[in-house]
From Swiss-Prot:
Functional description taken from the UniProt entry: Involved in the partitioning of the mitochondrial organelle and mitochondrial DNA (mtDNA) inheritance.
Compartments, record wording: Mitochondrion
Any one GO MF annotation of this record: GTPase activity
High-level lineage: Eukaryota, Fungi, Dikarya, Ascomycota, Taphrinomycotina
Protein name: Protein dml1
Highest taxon, organism lineage: Eukaryota
Length: 465
């Protein structure tokens, strides 16, 4: 196997990756006569109950967030597992109690999932069970629409509500990380056991709320990971998730802190990650649940080659070689478009990295690596004036594997089964970095001396192509 391990930090990141994991669950094949198109072992691991025939599949993931954001995770099954196995010790028992003591209303969708679990307890294959639709604006926590069981040993609540706010500083996250690491060793209690379970680690992916103090927390975390890995370098992709950056004329103080947090995080991630993808969560009229579902269209499709079977399979290192082949740096924006296969027009054309605009990026022919996927033949999607031979050679063509239709996404996205996503490095990235560099005002970074500030500016400037 070529496993991928995931770490998520913060509310926005966990919203995005909950959509990601829900999509992965749809690839599970329960009938031994069916042919699996996706190797779910890449991103999932198996846990066993007291009954050796009862198993559950959980993500290869460590989740960091504030306690309230865990809401009501589907932990009933795993509580029994924890009791029988003893868990990881007293440190975890304390953290689990902290989550359970937080009074949170159960979302109707979660109630329905729990009812289904009780009905199908012990059954390997679930029969039909009608689940309610999720109403817009009804989702408070990412756990409200999470379909999967999560291994409670790898849920890490950090008791600091300010971590999810962009009006608090990067330095707060750094301090909270070191406090947390002293109490719960983030390597020994987190990633190390997951790494040791793997046969051959393909890479790591980390999603970070980059405009909040989580940026400081995660930057320190990534340094620890790289120190522990030593010379054993594997692809490490970071998705920096933020809210839209306003123009200087309309920017509020917390928006300025958001830019500052991203600037400091990005400078500190230098050397700790091999690829960086900025992502922007909020689009016009959408709540976080809806906008993160759109981002998942891009993330899930872009990374699909890392887990499919057959000739369309690309490991993370293979994709990195494509991204770096033209010397375009390690920061890339993700542009995508989506539609129903039967439709001639693209229903959604956008950027996952910057504020959504209706622009067909594929016309620019600056794709470094792309993926097109649909439920049928894709050849017609790659023909026409927008794609020359050079562009097509950089695009992975995944046929007969459309985007699944899930009840956990907004209704308007459920019919979109055809997606084209590409990674580019263009003027938008350069402008974004220049804007971040300007945010490094001594008035807001008093914890950094002048020499360090100049070094940070130089690091950011080196990212400009």
């Amino acid at each position: 196997m070529h496993e991928i391990l995931t770490v998520t930090f913060g509310r926005k990141s966990n919203f995005c990756w909950t959509h990601f994991w829900n999509t992965q669950e749809s690839y599970f094949v329960y009938d031994p006569n069916d042919h699996a198109k996706v190797n779910v072992n890449t991103n999932f691991r198996v846990l066993k109950k007291r009954d050796p025939e009862a198993i559950v599949t959980v993500p290869r993931e460590c989740i960091y967030d504030t306690p309230i954001e865990f809401g009501n995770t589907r932990k009933n099954w795993l509580e029994e597992l924890n009791e029988s196995s003893g868990g990881k010790g007293t440190a975890w028992d304390g953290k689990l109690t902290q989550i359970m003591q937080t009074p949170v209303d159960v979302h109707p969708y979660q109630e329905a999932l729990w009812s289904r679990d009780e009905i199908h307890e012990g059954n390997a294959i679930e029969s039909e069970y009608e689940l309610p639709s999720i109403r817009p604006k009804s989702v408070k926590y990412w756990s409200d629409f999470n379909r999967l069981f999560l291994d409670t040993e790898y849920l890490f609540p950090v008791n600091c509500s300010e971590l999810n706010s962009s009006d608090f500083s990067f330095q707060l996250g750094v301090e909270r990380f070191h406090d947390f690491d002293k109490q719960f060793n983030v390597w020994d209690e987190g990633l190390r056991p997951l790494v040791e379970e793997c046969d051959s680690v393909q890479g790591f992916q980390a999603a970070i709320d980059i405009d909040t103090p989580w940026g400081g927390f995660a930057s320190e975390y990534m340094k620890v990971v790289q120190d522990e890995l030593g010379e054993c370098r594997v692809p490490t992709w970071v998705y920096g998730i933020r809210e839209p950056i306003q123009s200087d004329s309309s920017a509020t103080i917390d928006n300025h802190f958001g830019k500052l947090n991203e600037a400091l995080s990005l400078s500190q991630l230098n050397g700790s990650c091999s690829q960086y993808f900025p992502l922007c969560t909020i689009s016009q009229g959408d709540d976080l649940w809806a906008s993160s579902a759109k981002i998942n269209l891009a993330i899930e499709s872009f990374t699909l080659p890392t887990r499919v079977y057959g000739s369309s399979c690309y490991r993370m290192k293979d994709i990195e070689s494509k991204l770096q082949s033209e010397g375009r740096g390690f920061i890339h924006n993700l542009n995508f478009k989506a539609k129903n296969y039967s439709s001639k027009e693209w229903a959604l054309v956008s950027s996952a990295s910057f504020v959504n605009v209706a622009q067909d990026y594929s016309q620019q022919n600056n794709c470094l690596f792309g993926v097109v996927r649909s439920p049928k033949d894709n050849q017609g999607l790659l023909e026409g004036k927008n794609y020359n031979a050079s562009s097509i050679s950089k695009i992975v063509n995944i046929q007969n594997l459309g985007l699944p239709s899930l009840e956990t996404v907004p209704e308007g996205l459920r019919t979109l089964d055809t997606v084209f996503v590409e990674a580019t490095n263009d003027g938008q990235i350069n402008s974004h970095i220049q804007g971040l560099t300007k945010s490094l005002n001594r008035r807001f970074v008093s914890f950094v001396d002048q020499d360090e500030l100049e070094e940070i500016r130089e690091i950011l400037s080196s990212y400009i192509i």
